[in-house]
Amino acid sequence: MNRRLALQALGCLMLQSAPARADDTPALDALRSGGVLLLRHALTEPGIGDPPGFRLDDCSTQRNLSAAGRAQARAAGEALRARDVTVGAVCSSAWCRCIDTAKEMFPELQVAVLPALNSFFAGQGDRERQTSALRQWITALDGGRRVALVTHQVNVLALTGDNLAMGEAVVVQPDRRGGVRTAGRLAL
């Protein structure tokens, strides 16, 4: 009887620890047909926002990727390549944690800074202007060009309404009204 209970308990634990994986086929299909991969930067050192007095031109003054975040970004890039998904360009916020996420995920590409991706957390930047500029940038893309954009939680939320954890991604596409819609989430 004890052995049976132990096996049942072990089975329950195994079921609980099995990762749930959503069907990301719609997102992958959208990305392959020219969708935009919109990512929140990978895991960082503990904290919220950046330290007082941080500077964009000095990574040592910012909250940066942790070792786990660098590994997470590399694994995400490898997961995309394993699914035969490539991107032709990668753009990033000017924050080091976003640039480093992009470099770790896509080491073969040059990372271009796109100011519309810069954080507007805690009153920095201009939420409405940047979100509008990003929406226009995405809708102006050539439909067959696959692009990855690395940014911050507030930017993704403002553009799509999706609240992503660090390292999560959505695929977005222009809609028929001049806006942007989420085609799906990707488990990277």
Give the location of each predicted region.
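N-terminal export signals
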Residues: 5-21
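Active-site-proximal alpha-helix that buttresses catalytic centers in soluble enzyme cores
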Residues: 24-113, 120-124, 162-188
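Short, surface-exposed amphipathic charged segments that create phosphate/polyanion-binding patches used
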Residues: 125-133
